[in-house]
């Protein structure tokens, strides 16, 4: 979107979207098409809820309807915001009904009385998370794909699921970048269709 000059040089133009369409190049961005606001759409309460044909719309509706996610404010969901390590653990803790925690906080970077404190303690008690080493959990760090796969793998084991399911990572050209700790969880997550390529 912009002006092409001699020699194929390009001056970038500023995209301006109206109803999900760029007024300069007419490119469509489903994330910028507002939700229809139908009362049957749980995410319609968020001003930034993407359109129904956006790939994550149904998943957002599900987590909002089941009170697993509450948005970043009363009116925003921020669908492009990265999931933090604290967030993924909090989701699982909420899914479990937020049981009482009895153990001590094993991580020196998890402060008391934060929105995720009990979730992290619970996850550590049940061997769902083990931290990143040196007594740290890194609650605000981005949850990488292999970390999410590992946390879900340990949660499934905690729930008593059959873990003898193995997928094939050989179809991914970057499989060599998977950390040793995450190889088994990643093959499991692929087999369970929890993770696919990008």
Residue locations for each model-derived region?
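Thrombospondin type-1
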Residues: 1-39
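Intrinsically disordered, low-complexity segments enriched in glycine/proline and serine/threonine
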Residues: 9, 177-180, 187
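Conserved "repeat-terminator" motif of extracellular CCP/Sushi domains
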Residues: 9-10, 21-26, 91, 119, ...
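Feature responds to low-complexity, polar/acidic, surface-exposed segments characteristic
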Residues: 32-57, 70-118, 126-146, 154-182, ...
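A short amphipathic alpha-helical interaction element
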Residues: 60-63, 88, 92, 123, ...
